[in-house]
Structure formats: C-alpha cells, structure tokens
Curated annotation (Swiss-Prot):
Residues where a divalent metal cation binds: D155, D181, N182
Molecular functions (GO terms): metal ion binding; O-methyltransferase activity; S-adenosylmethionine-dependent methyltransferase activity
Gene that this polypeptide is encoded by: N4OMT
Pfam families reported in the protein's UniProt record: Methyltransf_3
Taxonomic placement: Eukaryota, Viridiplantae, Streptophyta, Embryophyta, Tracheophyta
Keyword Metal-binding: yes
Organism expressing this protein natively: Narcissus pseudonarcissus (Daffodil)
Keywords: Alkaloid metabolism, Metal-binding, Methyltransferase, S-adenosyl-L-methionine, Transferase
UniProt name for this protein: Norbelladine 4'-O-methyltransferase
Length: 239
C-alpha cells in the first residue's frame, strides 16, 4: 500500500509534521539552550541553498547529551556540511577530546570554521577532505586497540551507510555508539512505494528501508531508532 496524496504534502526535513509543536519544542527547549556559536552557524546555514542538510537544534542537543553521558573522547564524523553537528560534538567533548571529521567538500566546512574558532574548539578537530571509505579503510589498517573510537556520527551519502557500518563497527569500541542520521527520510520509509519524490530521493529512501531492516537484524549491535529531526538510529556495539 502506498501513501495517500495528503501524505505527500507532508514531506519536509523534520518528521514532526505538526509545525506548531515543532516550533514549540525549538523555542521552548532547544533555542534557549543553544550555544551562541551554534546559533550563529545555524542562522548562516539557514540562508544557504542546501540548508535542508542542517542538523536541527533539538537534534543537536540530543547528540550533545548522549556524548556527555557516554563520556566520549574520540569520535568520527562522516559528512560535515557547514559543521553544526561537528561543532556540537566539539563543544560536548572534554578539552583533550578529538574528532576525525571527513567530508568531500571543504568549502562547506569553511563556512562553519569561524564559529568553531570563536568557540575555541578548533584544536579538537582533524578535518579530512576525502571520500570516507578510503579513509576508513586506512584507519582500519593502522588501528590499534587503544585507538578505537567512542562514537561515530554519519550524515553523508545515504547509499553508502551500509558500507560505512561495516567499517565503523570495527573502528568503534565495544559499548561505543554509531549514529546514522536521516533514517526515517521524511517519514517516507513507512511506505513500500512513495510516488512524487525526486529520483535521487527515491534511491535514498529505498537505501534507508534496506538499512533499517539490516540494522534491526545485525547481532553486532543493539539499536534504538529515534524520531527526532529526520530520524536518528543509535547503534551500540556489542562485540
């Protein structure tokens, strides 16, 4: 069974389709707690033509809380864009925390760099301009037990999430967390068919349906799929 025509009109970045409730959450809980430099970066990014790729402020607070609860120190980020989630992570890590951030386009990262610098956390970030898979493969070749990561956040090319997972489940320590963004894909993953999407969005939608089924059956991790932003799946490595 496909979606109804009314469902199609609801496609947007956040799966919370009540605009009033979303506005309430952001204005009551998220924006008052948003770091000054994150606010500045968000406002600049919202004017960008690819602003839909911005991690929402309420999701950013969720990521920050998780990082602090985990006492994470070493993290990986695949897909940086202007760096909202990257700056969120850097602010949440301790002073000696380290982030390996990978993206194919450094020009987007440079939009956020002044805000990262003003926040005083640039020293925590190692930005690598590259496709992620070759970097991850090299990291696996050079990895020692003490070099394992606490946490990884993926918000990149959707069709490669499964490939990233196979690497990250070895790079992140047992008990560590791997997070995948956008896994509910505007809510469209609920339907076997979803007419009206752009062809590239339909490819990503099908990729997420396959990924969600795969992660739910992967014995190496336990998962929780959270309906915040556009959907975030948290994987905790078991072995």
């Amino acid at each position: 069974m496909g979606a109804s025509q009314d469902d199609y009109s609801l496609v947007h970045k956040n799966i919370l389709h009540s605009e009033d409730l979303l506005k309430y959450i952001l204005e009551t809980s998220a924006y008052p707690r948003e770091h000054e430099q994150l606010k500045g970066l968000r406002e600049v990014t919202e004017k960008h033509e690819w602003s839909s790729a911005l991690v929402p402020a309420d999701e950013g607070l969720f990521l920050s809380m998780l990082l602090k609860l985990m006492n994470a120190k070493r993290t990986i980020e695949i897909g940086v864009y202007t760096g909202y989630s990257l700056l969120t992570t850097a602010l949440a890590l301790p002073e000696d925390g380290k982030i390996t951030a990978i993206d194919v386009n450094k020009s987007f990262f440079e939009i956020g760099l002044p805000f990262i610098q003003k926040a005083g956390v640039e020293h925590k970030i190692n930005f690598i301009e590259s496709e992620a898979l070759p970097v991850l493969d090299q990291m696996l070749q050079e990895m020692k037990e003490e070099d394992l990561y606490d946490y990884a956040f993926v918000d990149a090319d959707k069709s490669n999430y499964a490939n990233y997972h196979e690497r990250l489940v070895k790079l992140v320590r047992i008990g560590g967390a791997i997070l995948y963004d956008n896994t509910l894909w505007y809510g469209s993953v609920a339907y076997p068919e979803y007419p009206g999407l752009y062809p590239e969005d339909e490819v990503d939608r099908l990729s997420f349906r396959n990924l969600n089924t795969f992660l739910a059956a992967d014995p190496r991790v336990e998962i929780s799929q959270v309906s915040i932003g556009d959907g975030v799946t948290i994987c905790r490595r078991l072995y």
